[in-house]
Amino acid sequence: GKNGHLGFIEPSEKWPPNTCYVSELAASTQNHTMILSEQTPPTIGVTLGLKSILDAKEILFIVTGMGKTAAYTKWLTKEITPNLPASILWKHPKVTLVTDL
C-alpha cells in the first residue's frame, strides 16, 4: 500500500503478534473503492500474522498503482522496520516482486 502496509498490518512503532492479526483499518483502506461499495463498510480487518507470512514457501509481492513510489523506494533500502511492514519480506529467502513502478 501507499504506506507500506502488508495485508492489514499497518505501520506502527512495534511489530504485531506473530499469529493471526486483527487491526483497525486505516482511513486509506476504509476509503478504498472495493470497500466503499459495501452497504456496511468494515472497520477492522483480519490478516495472517508475520510468522505465518514468513513461513510460506514462496511469496509473491505485488506493488502496483499510483502513490506507492515513496513506500516502494523506502522498501528498496532493505531496512527492516515496523514503520514499513512490507520490509519484513527481506527476511524471506524466496520473494518474487511484481511492480509497475
Feature roles, as predicted:
Residues 2-101:
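Conserved phosphate- and dinucleotide-binding cores of soluble alpha/beta proteins
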